[in-house]
Amino acid sequence: MAVLDVLIYPDENLAKVCQPVETVDAELNTFIDNMFDTMYEHEGIGLAAPQVNVLKRVITIDIEGDKTNQIVLINPEILESSGETGIEEGCLSIPGCRALVPRKEKLTVKALNREGQTFTLEADGLLAICIQHEIDHLNGVLFVDHISQLKRQRIKEKMLKLKKQIERAK
């Protein structure tokens, strides 16, 4: 397996809407394995394909981080949502920054699994928040799009400095 490069905000591909997956095959499953490897390497609990520069509707999640409850959502769609909640969210594409984001407390999601079969998942708490965060990525939305323009600009400046440091280190 491989650890993939994670795009850093404000990379323009993070703002693009992803295309649905047409075929679930061995190549996609290898990519999903690489997404999990990348997510664990960066100590994340969720990762969306556009974060690794693949504009497809694929999400990997493991809120426990122990590799026993891995969730794959291909072409996810929120069917129902209720309640209000929110936590300070972070993002692998915006390292070191967090912000309070309003989210729905409970969700029902329909998606394809790794075998290409349709399933529904009921989620609440942190899992529901994570699913919403990752689906936002598929729609070209980042958590900074939910906060004030001033805070967003400060984070953007911080990330541009970080990107320059990373480039110099290569």
UniProtKB/Swiss-Prot annotation:
Q: What class of enzyme is it?
A: hydrolase
Gene3D superfamilies associated with the record: Peptide deformylase (3.90.45.10)
Signal peptide residues on this chain, from the entry's feature table: none
So which cofactors does this thing need? Fe(2+)
Task: Cite the entry's keywords alphabetically.
Answer: Hydrolase, Iron, Metal-binding, Protein biosynthesis
A GO molecular-function annotation: metal ion binding
Keyword Protein biosynthesis in the entry? The reply is yes
The free-text note explaining how the cofactor binds reads: Binds 1 Fe(2+) ion.
This entry's Enzyme Commission designation comes to 3.5.1.88
Q: What does this protein do?
A: Removes the formyl group from the N-terminal Met of newly synthesized proteins. Requires at least a dipeptide for an efficient rate of reaction. N-terminal L-methionine is a prerequisite for activity but the enzyme has broad specificity at other positions.
The record's family statement is: Belongs to the polypeptide deformylase family.
List the protein's name.
Answer: Peptide deformylase
Q: Which organism is it from?
A: Glaesserella parasuis serovar 5 (strain SH0165)
